[in-house]
A protein has these predicted regions:
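Short, contiguous alpha-helical
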Residues: 35-85, 114, 126-178
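A short secondary-structure junction motif
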Residues: 25, 29-32, 71, 120-123, ...
Length: 178
């Protein structure tokens, strides 16, 4: 039983599993529902995918690669960049893109990320940099937040599907919450 931090091979397996879950769900979901917005201002599934793609590049694998390339030990002053997620989402305009292409883009990035994570050493986990909003982030911190982040957005995608099904449930709505 793991009671402490998740080791890199476990994180790599969880990252792979998240990608497989996303692929399975989006493959089954009809294309028109990829662009369904459950409420004004909420992301459609394609926008969630775009966010995951950008997070892979800018937030997780990207930051880990920067930290490793710098050889930065935690607290040495390596500055990590923040990014405006809403502005990036608007600029990407993923709602207008093909959902299958977004899934494939994420899958390719994720395969490289899984290899990166699987190859991390114990010494790599304590390396880090300083984020402008949250302060010190180590590779270990990023790995655990990555697992959490994936599941949060998988839940968001699944909730979008639930939101699309809800109005068509008739009396069965009484069995559950919207």
């Amino acid at each position: 039983m793991i009671t402490g931090p998740l080791p890199p091979p476990v994180v790599a397996a969880l990252l792979h599993a998240a990608s497989a879950t996303i692929h399975a769900e989006l493959s089954a979901l009809p294309a028109p529902l990829h662009a369904f917005h459950p409420a004004p201002g909420e992301w459609c599934v394609k926008e969630v995918l775009g966010h995951l793609i950008e997070s892979e590049q800018r937030g997780f694998a990207g930051r880990i690669r920067i930290i490793l390339a710098a050889g930065a030990r935690a607290g040495e002053g390596l500055a990590l960049e923040g990014w405006d997620q809403d502005a990036v989402a608007r600029a990407r305009n993923d709602c207008a893109r093909d959902g299958a292409a977004l899934v494939e883009e994420l899958a390719q990035l994720r395969a490289a990320s899984v290899s990166l994570v699987a190859g991390l050493t114990p010494a790599d986990l304590s390396r880090g940099g300083r984020h402008p909003k949250v302060g010190l982030l180590t590779v270990a911190d990023l790995l655990h937040e990555w697992v959490h982040h994936d599941r949060n957005h998988i839940r968001q995608m699944l909730a979008n599907v639930q939101g699309a099904a809800w109005p068509h449930m008739g009396a069965a709505q009484r069995f559950s919450l919207p």
